[in-house]
Structures are given as structure tokens and as C-alpha cells.
Curated annotation (Swiss-Prot):
Optimum pH is 5.5. Monomer. One of its GO terms (biological process) is coenzyme M biosynthetic process. Pathway: Cofactor biosynthesis; coenzyme M biosynthesis; sulfoacetaldehyde from phosphoenolpyruvate and sulfite: step 2/4. Inhibited by vanadate. This is 2-phosphosulfolactate phosphatase. GO terms for molecular function: 2-phosphosulfolactate phosphatase activity; magnesium ion binding; sulfopyruvate decarboxylase activity.
Length: 224
């Protein structure tokens, strides 16, 4: 059964979960895993060690951090990040919603899903019978970008769908890109100067990297 899990802090969604934060944590993590092997996850905004710090609060880069939660900024600085990572520095990420959901979710296998890796994350879970798609939403308010992101991933999944997934799939049959581009999450990012992140985040299947969250080590590692 393929289900949509919204109440991630209150009960176990299922044995296998795909966390979806299109704008932008899932997209940023997937982008990072296209050229490094692991990303540490934290909910803290403090800097405690020599590392590459990436993060935002309410869309804005955290003061003193190396980079914001911006996939296009990450790509623009790919060589710098990769060199520092290969020289032994950890990459540490914190975001308003996505990292909080990862920390609180109770599932045995937690994958990182986005529009940019939709078919690849679906492939990663193809051997599991029951899969929960977990939209992060925006500070506990409904975010249509994450709902549609779940639908885009569900297109590549086989199995019986619950009613929420069916609704998300129905949206993907129409002009779903415009819905995301005009969403409140997208408008907020545009107002902060991150319009390129929004257009990047809707590039379906543009990155073949998939991350899996290792909760005991507080990090996402490249699955494939």
C-alpha cells in the first residue's frame, strides 16, 4: 500500500518512508549527494566544529553559515564543497522544516525524495510492499509543492494507493509546475531572491542520487 503520512510526529508512518520537502531541503540534500557521500542533519543553528555549515531559518541563510539551504548555491560552489569534504570536513545541514521532520520521523527506512530524483527514489523502494510518502509542509501548514512532489514520486511507484496519494497523482496530470511556481512557498523564496531554486526544484528526474537517513548517526548517506 502506498500511503500519504501527514501526522509524522504522532505515529509510525510505516516501515519505509520517503520524506518530501521540495522547497528545499530534499532538493538540497539530493543535490549534495550528487557529488559527496553523506550529509549530517541537525536542528541546531550553532557551530560546534570545523565543518561546512549549510542552513536556513524561514528561508534565510543562517548568519555565520557557509551556505544557505539553496541547491543552486550548492551547485555554484560544488568544487569548493567537494574539496573541503574530501579534506575531511563534515557537511552539516539544518533547515526550518525538512531536518526537523527527519529527526522526528519513526520509520525503519527513511529515504529522501524530491521531484529532481522522483523516479530514482521510487526505484530505491521498489522491493518494499508498503511505502509512506511524507510531505514536510511549511511549519505544519499545508504546502502544495510537497503534496505535488509526493504525487510526482507516486507516478513511478507500483501498488495500491490511498485516497491522498490518488489526489496528489491527479494534480500531476495537469499543469502542476505552475501550481508550484505560484505557491506560497515559492512566492516566499522569490521574495528572498531564490527564484532559481524554485525552477531548479521542479526539474523532474534531473538528479539520479538518492539519500537514506541513518537516524542513529544523524546523517543522510548516498543509497545509489
Amino acid at each position: 500500500m502506498i500511503t500519504l503520512c501527514n501526522r509524522f510526529t504522532e505515529y509510525k508512518c510505516g516501515n519505509v518512508a520517503i520524506v518530501v520537502d521540495v522547497l528545499r531541503a530534499s532538493t538540497t540534500i539530493t543535490t549534495l549527494l550528487s557529488f559527496i557521500d553523506e550529509v549530517y542533519i541537525t536542528t541546531s543553528t550553532s557551530k560546534k566544529e570545523n565543518a561546512i555549515y549549510i542552513g536556513e531559518r524561514k528561508g534565510r541563510k543562517i548568519e555565520g553559515f557557509d551556505f544557505g539551504n539553496s541547491p543552486t548555491e550548492i551547485l555554484a560552489n560544488k568544487d569548493i564543497i567537494k574539496e573541503r569534504y574530501e579534506n575531511g570536513e563534515k557537511v552539516i545541514l539544518t533547515t526550518t522544516n525538512g531536518t526537523r521532520v527527519l529527526k522526528s520521523l519513526d520509520a525503519e527506512h527513511i529515504f529522501i525524495g524530491a521531484i529532481v530524483n522522483a523516479k530514482y527514489v521510487a526505484k530505491a523502494v521498489e522491493d518494499f510492499e508498503d511505502v509512506s510518502l511524507v510531505p514536510c509542509h511549511r511549519e505544519n501548514n499545508f504546502a502544495i509543492d510537497d503534496f505535488i512532489g509526493c504525487g510526482v514520486i507516486a507516478k513511478y511507484l507500483n501498488g495500491e494507493f490511498d485516497e491522498f496519494i490518488k489526489a496528489a497523482l491527479e494534480l500531476t496530470k495537469h499543469d502542476w509546475m505552475s501550481l508550484i511556481l505560484n505557491s506560497s512557498s515559492a512566492e516566499n523564496l522569490k521574495n528572498l531572491g531564490y527564484e532559481k531554486d524554485v525552477t531548479f526544484a521542479i526539474l523532474e528526474n534531473s538528479i539520479d542520487a538518492v539519500g537514506i537517513y541513518k537516524k542513529d548517526k544523524s546523517k543522510v548517506v548516498r543509497f545509489k
